[in-house]
């Protein structure tokens, strides 16, 4: 049995703590705030409740695997349901696309928008099939060997082709390019700096669908917190980690204000920049910055919108309608990116979605406030070209017995990838 200290009680830290405890390790989890879950939480005011971060996820198998390997299966703990639509897109030329999750549905919807668009989009998505299969085996689902990458992986990681450049060659319709780049723009990345192979996100959306928890995504964190208690994890809330203690070049403890907590293995599931011993290892990276967020409580008649609507342009606006509200009321969240020179609800009204008269409550959150609340950006490391994939830590680090998980670790941000990061660390450490 090894003593493992996990730094960070967001989804990544909770997932890796549960996995390691189930395999027999003595696990202590440190969380700086009073609550677990991090960005996988909720905001509640005046009877309204909104998802604080993600409102849906990809790759449901990641959650199912986590729950199956740490105790009761997912289906016995919470509802995880598929969504019929990936999202609705409203383009600057006043055309609208409700994008289904299935390949056949996407073909039909795009051909209805303009004949021939469906086949072009299908060919684009299909082109990432091999990327996913190669990287799934050697990067996403198993700890990668940085010094001995298989040739198919090395070719992708060394490629200078960025997503923007590939799309200019393969997708001549501006609306299709906006479909392909939206997931990255929404998380603060410039497609000119995102490797082309990361376009596989469109493949994952189509192949595996988008899924949500009807009661709110925070339920995942609540159930995981109970799972930690079941597995005997010692959870220290309100206990920020100040640094990882190194002795003879290896990690031996985590420093807190109350003293050092000895460890045989340390897992850092927060932004490494916040820990002096790790900061030099990530000095070539930058965090991706959260959007401007406005949670609104509405009353009366409002437009009937799907769970997510993307309003293309500058600023880029995203409307999420799946919050919980009392009868006769509605809970929406609006994200804004780009040139935001006016109130988000006023900007929304310019797209003919005017709910200012229905507003009864609002919660505004700036990028700075979000980072301060969570201690770091939940969007992880900013893509700065092909070097980013190697500059990001995880599951190992150059320091023996020190590992990283979470949004700032391999393989990246987003609920499914953070879940995979936890599985990678658990596999690397192994059973007790």
Which positions does each model-derived feature cover?
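A conserved FAD-binding loop/helix module that cradles the flavin
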Residues: 54, 407-430
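N-terminal glycine-rich phosphate/pyrophosphate-binding loop and immediately adjacent elements
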Residues: 2-133
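Helical element adjacent to the flavin cofactor pocket in flavoenzyme catalytic cores
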Residues: 200-251, 255-257
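A glycine-rich dinucleotide-binding beta-alpha-beta segment and adjacent secondary-structure elements
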Residues: 173-187, 354-411
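C-terminal segments that line or cap access tunnels to active or ligand-binding sites in enzymes
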Residues: 294-373
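Mid-domain catalytic core of redox enzymes
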Residues: 242-329
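Hydrophobic anchor at the start of a short beta-strand
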Residues: 25-27, 266, 357
